[in-house]
Amino acid sequence: AAVDMLQADALEVHLNAAQELWMAEGDKDTCGLLANLVQIRDAVSVPVIVKETGCGIAAEQYELLLEQGFTAFDCAGAGGTNFPAIEAKRQGVELTEEFAAWGVPTCWSLLDAQQTLPQNALLLASGGIRSAGDAARAFALGADAVGITAPLLRLVMEQGVDAAVDYVHSLAEGLQKYMLLLGCLTPKELRDVPLIVTGETRDFIASRGYELAKLCRWRRG
């Protein structure tokens, strides 16, 4: 009913198990979660996007969702807003260090998607996207679009809507500059730009058994 009332073009259903664990009113029973997702998808007439909430989607979850016929995802990886920390603070408790670091970073979730999703899947990147450079890297890793929330909300609250609009324009202009410098006419063409991978992300690629040289030369078409 809500989809029809809003004349929505799509429905985004979020996964937030980690957040629920630290919510006083949280639902800690995840039994039947996948079946519920399928039921929702089958009940609506618009595409359903499966979205995480700051903990990322790993290859194993992509595969499980693909098996159930889902083809649109928002990885919403770790690196941005930490919802378990927000819920813990709301209750006046401290989130321990081991759980404060829980989640798949957005970059790693995109790399897992590279190796898992078919080319016709829709892949959105969010979670720690703060700059034009972040957006360019996400597009280079195969994202079809990027999502940004926290900086916009902060600007609206502290400086007003106009400041948030200026921020979006600045991001768009910055992305265009990256595209020009890299010889790309569209964000999608950033996927053809060779990558240099170092540090923990290089270790992640090795631990996953992905072929580094091939991945650095080609991503989702």
Residue spans of the language-model regions?
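Alpha/beta catalytic cores of nucleotide-metabolism and tRNA/nucleoside-modifying enzymes
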Residues: 97-122, 130-221
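Alpha/beta enzyme core
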Residues: 1-126, 132-155
